[in-house]
Regions:
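Bacterial N-terminal signal peptides that target proteins for export
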Residues: 1-8
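Bacterial N-terminal signal peptides
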Residues: 8-18
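Carbohydrate-interacting regions of secretory-pathway proteins
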Residues: 23-302
Length: 302
């Protein structure tokens, strides 16, 4: 009887050891790297020009608004970007009071970025009366403040109420398979449409195929996959936009856009991010391979 008890105990201990070893092995082989911590140690903050309605101690606007200077790097007096701990994990709070960019210290080539995001309540000028707005900028290159005195040149995965995943080309360009659909006035609008001809976007917006945004206050999962000059925008598991042939500008001879930093915008709306993580990506998963056009057409620019 004692031998049976000892045997049962030994089996139990062995099972426990094997279970722990398997869990530890899985953790050790995980390629996801968390990018968010209480000190934002993997990021730097650049704050743009405050709206005249937002008082900032020590800041004076120029007589000519075009000559207003951004607050600049590591100068965030209103604490636009802060981190708080919620249930033991860091949550990035973006007040939206002033346009800004939270910029990764590292540049990335092939990557899979995954975040959870939700809207807050407050909105600020000049975005009052407009949809809440934010954005995940990637393939960022060049100087801080190159775009609107605040952001770097980049491709943008738009994060805006009811159209998360749109493409905005802020200095970078990319091609999207898309078709025209009715716009307002003389503006042409384009929507990503699988199998449609490729068109070049250099500053204009390529609307997503479909949106699966959860109600305000709920956490959405946003993913950006980028390999070489191609990328995907994914919202809550659904592909919203497919980009390819990205370059550093519309002029002939501009180099292919295959690496860069990541920026998270502040753009007039309160919001939160959590579980910001990234992993290397050598190629797109098999289920996404067929989404890209097999040809590099010479598209016209909308």
């Amino acid at each position: 009887m004692k031998m049976k008890s000892w045997f049962a105990l030994a089996v139990g201990l062995t099972t426990c050891v094997r279970t722990l070893t398997a869990a530890e092995t899985a953790a050790a082989t995980s390629t996801w790297t968390p990018l968010l911590d209480p000190n934002l140690s993997q990021w730097e903050i650049f704050i743009g020009v405050p709206d005249v309605s937002i008082p900032v101690p020590g800041y004076t606007h120029a007589a000519n608004p075009k000559q207003d200077k951004p607050l600049g790097l590591t100068n965030d007096p209103l604490h636009v970007y802060t981190v708080r701990m919620v249930d033991g994990e860091p949550v990035l709070h973006i007040s939206g009071e002033i346009f800004g960019g939270l910029t990764s210290l590292k540049s990335y080539d092939g990557f899979h970025l995954r975040v959870q995001f939700r809207w807050g309540i407050n909105k600020f000028a000049p975005k009052l009366g407009k949809p809440r707005d934010n954005g995940i900028l990637y393939r960022c290159f060049g100087a801080h403040g190159a775009v609107n005195h605040v952001w770097k040149h980049c491709l943008e995965c738009q994060v805006q109420e009811n159209d998360i995943g749109d493409l905005f080309s802020l200095g970078g360009i990319a091609e999207v398979a898309c078709r025209e659909y009715p716009g307002t006035g003389t503006n042409k609008l384009w929507r990503y449409t699988p199998g449609a001809p490729l068109r070049l976007f250099g500053g204009r917006c390529a609307r997503g195929l479909d949106y699966h945004e959860l109600p305000n206050g709920e956490w959405n999962t946003i993913e950006v996959m980028a390999v070489g000059d191609r990328s995907l925008h994914i919202l809550n598991g659904h592909v919203v936009n497919v980009l390819q042939n990205a370059k550093k500008g519309v002029e002939a001879g501009k180099p292919t856009l295959v690496s860069g930093q990541i920026q998270i915008q502040s753009e007039g709306a309160e919001c939160e991010y959590r579980r910001i993580e990234i992993q290397p990506l050598a190629d797109f998963p098999a289920e996404y391979q067929g989404l890209f056009s097999a040809t590099n057409a010479s598209p016209s620019q909308p």
